[in-house]
Amino acid sequence: LPTSFQDEEGDTGLRIAFDFDGVVAGDEAEKKFQSEGMKAFQQEEIDKKMQPLQAGPLQSLFSKLSQLQKLDAERGKDDPYYEPAIRIAVVTSRGAPSEQRLITTLKSFGMYAAELFLLDGMPKKPILNVLKPHIFFDDQLKHLQENTIPSVLIPFGINSK
């Protein structure tokens, strides 16, 4: 999507942000939420908190970037002044009590995010404006339209219809 994003001079790190459901993970939880409402969604997430969600369309990309992030963190672990070369964030509308299934899913894929923002339905824009990712991936246009950061719509699943 068009943007007026300007990278800061001297900024050497790469920041990438992902939505979770319908992007990193499949959209089975989103389908439950849209078809049966918040209460049914939350109960299912509690009941299945130890069962990972299916992979989403960008799971492979997220996983590979996560491995690079781990290698980079290992490289700088003994240097207190080390600036990470890559930082991955998950910025999701999820909140309590559905966070455990998100964590279970990330662990099952062997993935790691440097930052995890569980917004519990709050707007993503304020977090993204502070985080300033170089790119943000989301499956819902409403989360991207007012952003001033480079964003990519992932047309996947129930939200692409």
Question: Predicted segment positions?
Answer:
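Alpha-helical substrate-recognition element adjacent to the catalytic core
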Residues: 9-12, 17-118
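Asp-based, Mg2+/Mn2+-dependent phosphohydrolase catalytic module
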Residues: 1-16, 20-47, 129-130, 135, ...
